[in-house]
Amino acid sequence: MDTPNKDDSIIRFSVSLQQNLLDELDNRIIKNGYSSRSELVRDMIREKLVEDNWAEDNPNDESKIAVLVVIYDHHQRELNQRMIDIQHASGTHVLCTTHIHMDEHNCLETIILQGNSFEIQRLQLEIGGLRGVKFAKLTKASSFEHNE
């Protein structure tokens, strides 16, 4: 029989907040469809852990994962090739790309990246700075261990 691992258990703790902050928390729960305050707080903690993980400046840490979403004018001359060249030249691993034709003028591309935070963010800035790129947003992720 397996004995429960301390890390697998849910720990209950209390938090003291001002009323206006609690009201904001409750409004966010309703707005985002959370089932409880605990669910929202867990998500907020996870988000902060990812943010802190990305802030750690370790050039040898290649474990960062991100998705770069790019919207661009596909009529812009040689833009697609320049985006590909930047990806190939970067120190970041491009794990996957997906290309979608949004309309007659615009394409959306998602680029899944793995590497260190500096190289990933540099790639975002390089692609985002190209003429014809209308939007370039990086969503950062991290693979820290946690239980649902």
Swiss-Prot record:
InterPro entries: Acetolactate_synth/TF_NikR_C, ACT-like_dom_sf, Arc_rbn_hlx_hlx, CopG, CopG/NikR_regulator, Ni_resp_reg_NikR, Ribbon_hlx_hlx, TF_NikR_Ni-bd_C. It comes from the Bacteria. Binds 1 nickel ion per subunit. Pfam families: NikR_C, RHH_1. The keyword Transmembrane does not apply. GO terms for molecular function: DNA-binding transcription repressor activity; nickel cation binding; transcription cis-regulatory region binding. Its cofactor is Ni(2+). GO terms for biological process: negative regulation of DNA-templated transcription; response to nickel cation. Keywords: DNA-binding, Metal-binding, Nickel, Transcription, Transcription regulation. GO terms for cellular component: protein-DNA complex. The keyword Transcription applies. Transcriptional regulator. PANTHER family: NICKEL-RESPONSIVE REGULATOR. Belongs to the transcriptional regulatory CopG/NikR family. This is Putative nickel-responsive regulator.
